[in-house]
């Protein structure tokens, strides 16, 4: 190779410019750490196609993929949180609300919709964990009560997907009151003979697990979901004992009778639809009959 060819030999040139890959194209599984194509993961309902790990899912996306596409109507969207106590810790509560609304694209931590599931009428709600850890404040409680009222008005079942760290500390006693408020609303639903399906997703903790999340006529856990009241370390320090591995996972809770079944997210529509048809004595051409087994 001549000196001139050496100068123009492109194989010796190393580009310093990085390949332009749009943000969000790839996602790493939080369990097996495989790099996944985001569009494929979304089509698979945020379940890893490699290891079946159920990743956290946006509340609105969950409801849109759970309910039938036609006839969905949002309930309680007009309710927005207010800083009544003028609460301030390291940051003003008012500022925390604004930041959470911007990052989550939701006005609070619960989204409620009325619609149909496999052509059967239903009201469904889902917690948005990215909004202050899915914490339950006065707006979450009020929206849940509206969901119960809508189910009673339409004489249909209620489904709730929980994903929460518990009561919202910035609302103090008002947030704790939501535990009683939501429980009382579910008692009204029960008196009407309408079923409540509680789906416990990762994580369901604190005041939400101690109230509405465990009051389902049928309590369903997603695979390996973290479900409990206090964290492992707090419990071990209190009881002064070592606790079994995975004692707050849905599989352990199913084994010990705390929940009724574990259902893969990709099968949730058919499973709940079948249970709804059976419990309300309705028929739908889209429902596959259930045998009642776990």
From Swiss-Prot:
It is found in: Cytoplasm. PANTHER family: ACETYL-COENZYME A CARBOXYLASE CARBOXYL TRANSFERASE SUBUNIT BETA, CHLOROPLASTIC. One of its GO terms (biological process) is malonyl-CoA biosynthetic process. NCBIfam families: accD. Belongs to the AccD/PCCB family. The lineage of its organism: Bacteria, Pseudomonadati, Pseudomonadota, Gammaproteobacteria, Vibrionales. Component of the acetyl coenzyme A carboxylase (ACC) complex. Biotin carboxylase (BC) catalyzes the carboxylation of biotin on its carrier protein (BCCP) and then the CO(2) group is transferred by the transcarboxylase to acetyl-CoA to form malonyl-CoA. Its EC number is 2.1.3.15. GO terms for molecular function: acetyl-CoA carboxylase activity; ATP binding; carboxyl- or carbamoyltransferase activity; zinc ion binding. Coiled coil: none annotated. Gene3D superfamilies: 2-enoyl-CoA Hydratase, Chain A, domain 1. Residues 25-294 form the CoA carboxyltransferase N-terminal domain. InterPro entries: AcCoA_carboxyl_beta, Acetyl_CoA_COase_Trfase_b_su, ClpP/crotonase-like_dom_sf, COA_CT_N, Znf-ACC. Zn(2+) binds at residues 29, 32, 48, 51. Its cofactor is Zn(2+). Acetyl-CoA carboxylase is a heterohexamer composed of biotin carboxyl carrier protein (AccB), biotin carboxylase (AccC) and two subunits each of ACCase subunit alpha (AccA) and ACCase subunit beta (AccD). A zinc finger (C4-type) spans 29-51. It holds the Pfam family Carboxyl_trans. Pathway: Lipid metabolism; malonyl-CoA biosynthesis; malonyl-CoA from acetyl-CoA: step 1/1. This is Acetyl-coenzyme A carboxylase carboxyl transferase subunit beta. One of its GO terms (cellular component) is acetate CoA-transferase complex.
């Amino acid at each position: 190779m001549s000196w001139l060819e050496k100068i123009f030999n492109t194989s010796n040139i190393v580009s310093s410019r990085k390949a332009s890959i749009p943000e969000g194209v790839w996602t790493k599984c939080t369990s097996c750490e495989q790099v996944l194509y985001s569009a494929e993961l979304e089509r698979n309902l945020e379940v890893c196609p490699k290891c079946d790990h159920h990743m956290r899912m946006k509340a609105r996306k969950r409801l849109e993929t759970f309910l039938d596409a036609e006839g969905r109507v949002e309930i309680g969207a007009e309710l927005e949180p207010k800083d009544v106590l003028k609460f301030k810790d390291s940051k003003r509560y008012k500022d925390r609300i604004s930041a959470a609304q911007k990052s989550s694209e939701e006005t609070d931590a619960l989204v409620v919709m009325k619609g149909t599931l496999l052509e059967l009428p239903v009201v469904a709600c889902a917690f948005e964990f990215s909004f202050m850890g899915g914490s339950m404040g006065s707006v979450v409680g009020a929206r849940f009560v509206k969901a119960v009222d809508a189910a009673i008005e339409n004489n249909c079942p209620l489904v709730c997907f929980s994903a929460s760290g518990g009561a919202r500390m910035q609302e103090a006693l008002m947030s704790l009151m939501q535990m009683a408020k939501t429980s009382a609303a579910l008692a009204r639903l029960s008196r009407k003979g309408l079923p409540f399906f509680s789906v416990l997703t990762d994580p369901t903790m604190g005041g939400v697990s101690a109230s509405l999340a465990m009051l389902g006529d049928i309590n369903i856990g997603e695979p390996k979901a973290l479900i409990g009241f206090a964290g492992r370390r707090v419990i071990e320090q209190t009881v002064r004992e070592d606790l079994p591995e995975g004692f707050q996972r849905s599989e352990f809770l199913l084994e010990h009778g705390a929940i009724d079944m574990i259902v893969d997210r990709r099968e949730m529509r058919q499973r709940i639809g079948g249970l709804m048809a059976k419990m309300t004595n309705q028929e739908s051409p889209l429902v596959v009959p259930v045998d009642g087994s776990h």
